[in-house]
From Swiss-Prot:
Function: Inhibits all the catalytic activities of DNA gyrase by preventing its interaction with DNA. Acts by binding directly to the C-terminal domain of GyrB, which probably disrupts DNA binding by the gyrase.
Region called Disordered, residue ranges: 42-64
Protein name: DNA gyrase inhibitor YacG
Gene for this chain: yacG
Keyword Coiled coil: no
Cofactor: Zn(2+)
């Protein structure tokens, strides 16, 4: 017996069957996938954490 995994679409809350028959998983549709992508692109969503200073060398050109 195969267990079917059902997840909620993170955008609209619709039940989505997790598998190859759901190509946009975890989203229910391409529309919900693109809405979510747009929110990330517009920086409405973010992963919490300290600011990334990896490309900063600790000085500003304005100091000199």
């Amino acid at each position: 017996m195969t267990k079917i995994t059902i997840v909620k679409c993170p955008q609209c809350g619709t039940d989505v069957e997790w598998g190859e028959q759901s190509p946009h998983r975890p989203f229910c549709s391409k529309k919900c996938q693109m809405i979510d992508f747009g929110e990330w692109a517009d920086e409405e969503n973010a992963i919490p954490g300290a600011p990334d200073m990896s490309d900063s060398d600790g000085w500003s050109e304005e100091q000199y």
